[in-house]
UniProtKB/Swiss-Prot annotation:
Family: Belongs to the class-I aminoacyl-tRNA synthetase family. MshC subfamily.
Any single Pfam family the record assigns to this protein: tRNA-synt_1e
GO biological process per UniProt: cysteinyl-tRNA aminoacylation; mycothiol biosynthetic process
Species per Swiss-Prot/TrEMBL record: Arthrobacter sp. (strain FB24)
Entry protein name: L-cysteine:1D-myo-inositol 2-amino-2-deoxy-alpha-D-glucopyranoside ligase
């Protein structure tokens, strides 16, 4: 599947120091050593209701990491998936009378257009679940052969043969096992907390025939009226959610890759189970670090499809709003915090953008180098975008207070820095 096209990123003098991020799996900050090679996997959308502000905030957050690495002279391998077949997509297609493939294609196109408008750097590989089924099937077959997956007898009216991952068996390792996954390794949650979230986030803890309530689906055998694909010894069907990302990451990235990213709602079960699948398949951890973006609400309320209060990037753009201002409104909040989109906050972002542009024409001589150093220091510290924005604010105030003409060299350098590090074009 093709990705969108990235805009050129200006090259700046000097380099970003090694980036420190908060690692969810260890509950502490970790420094990402500047080894020269970095790798990033960010879980993509299920293509319906794209692109809401929660989506946008998550991809802008990890775009900051991508940019910070590149500014530090690192080569970055970046992969993003798209879950282009899943229950929510099929349910929306049925409810609206649209073929699920057409719905997915239109929403993927809209998402990519929004990402390009927000100046999010494109992944090197943008990979759909459907196109990955030929690799997913043998991975599930291997888990069956290893005794880490099992088939479930169908309930009345349902077919036999759905395949589930055995989390208890997968959590058992020899004393020599290195960096072995066990249930809770990523999330750090109690079983009670896991059960609650599992039911809320696509799991089926009450499914009869499962060995453990938290066992996730690997393969759903074919049902009438649902799309299905050849599954070898699994029978016709379609993959579960978590195994898709594991297989895609293992195909395109080193093992372990540097950072697994996504929204905080993916910590459990998605990232937890994906990490388990990876270790079960290869004996190697999926990722070295796990980082997560906060949730976005609207005017203090949870933003959700069911409430119908989604703020869509495409609707803002259609109303004539500038994508750079949308991006600035997102960057005003630290990526790990939960926050709400408000009209007041968006107005502040538009004012800030205008003030930066006004100040650019008055850029004081030899001011750019200090600003770049301050921005890099903030972004290297757990991608502290609000701190970087505050540094530009201070520079803009000083620029407006100076007498005389601005420096063309510093004007160009500040413009390049705000673009390269924050993804905002002045």
């Amino acid at each position: 599947m093709k990705s969108w096209i990235s805009r050129p990123v200006p090259q700046l003098p000097g380099r970003m120091p090694a980036v420190r991020i908060f690692d969810t799996a260890v509950g502490a900050y970790s420094t990402l050593d500047a080894t020269g090679e970095q790798s990033l996997y960010v879980c993509g959308i299920t293509p319906y209701d794209a692109t809401h502000m929660g989506h946008a905030a998550s991809y802008v957050a990890f775009d900051l990491l991508n940019r910070a690495w590149r500014d530090g002279g690192q080569r970055v391998a970046y992969v993003q998936n798209v879950t282009d077949v899943d229950d929510p997509l099929l349910e929306r297609a049925t409810a609206t009378g649209v073929d699920w493939r057409d719905l997915a294609a239109s929403q993927i196109e809209l998402f990519q257009t929004d990402m390009a408008a927000l100046n999010v750097l494109a992944p090197d590989h943008y990979v759909g679940a459907v196109e990955s089924i030929p690799e997913i099937v043998p991975a599930i077959e291997r888990l069956l052969h290893l005794g880490l997956a099992y088939r479930v007898t169908g309930t009345p009216g349902e077919p036999d043969g759905d395949v589930y991952y055995d989390v208890e068996a997968a959590s058992k390792h020899s004393a020599e096992a290195k960096d072995a996954w066990t249930l809770g390794s990523v999330s750090g949650l109690s079983e009670t907390e896991m059960l609650e979230l599992f039911a809320e986030r696509g799991g089926d803890p009450g499914r009869r025939g499962k060995r453990q309530a938290l066992d996730p689906l690997l393969w759903r055998v074919a049902r009438d009226g649902e799309p299905s694909w050849a599954g070898g010894e699994l029978g016709s069907g379609r993959p579960g959610w978590h195994i898709e990302c594991t297989v895609i990451a293992q195909k395109y990235l080193p093992a372990p890759f540097t950072v697994q990213g996504g929204g905080s709602d993916l910590i459990f079960p998605h990232h937890e189970m994906g990490a388990g699948h990876a270790y079960s398949l290869t004996g190697v951890p999926l990722a070295r670090h796990f980082a997560h973006a906060g949730m976005v609400g609207l005017d203090g309320e949870k933003m959700s499809k069911s409430k119908g209060n989604l703020v869509l990037v495409s609707k803002l753009r259609a109303a004539g709003e500038e994508p750079a201002a949308i991006r600035l409104a997102i960057l005003a909040h630290h990526y790990r915090t939960d926050w709400s989109w408000t009209e007041a906050g968006f107005a502040q972002a538009k004012t800030r953008l205008a003030e930066w542009r006004d100040a650019l024409t008055m850029a004081p001589g030899e001011s750019a180098a200090t600003l770049i150093a301050e921005m890099r220091s903030e972004l290297a510290n757990d991608l502290n975008a609000p701190g970087a924005l505050a540094a530009v604010d201070r520079w803009a105030v000083a620029a407006k207070q100076q007498a005389g003409a601005g420096s063309p060299m510093d004007q160009a350098l500040v413009s390049d820095a705000v673009n390269a590090l924050l993804g905002v074009e002045l």
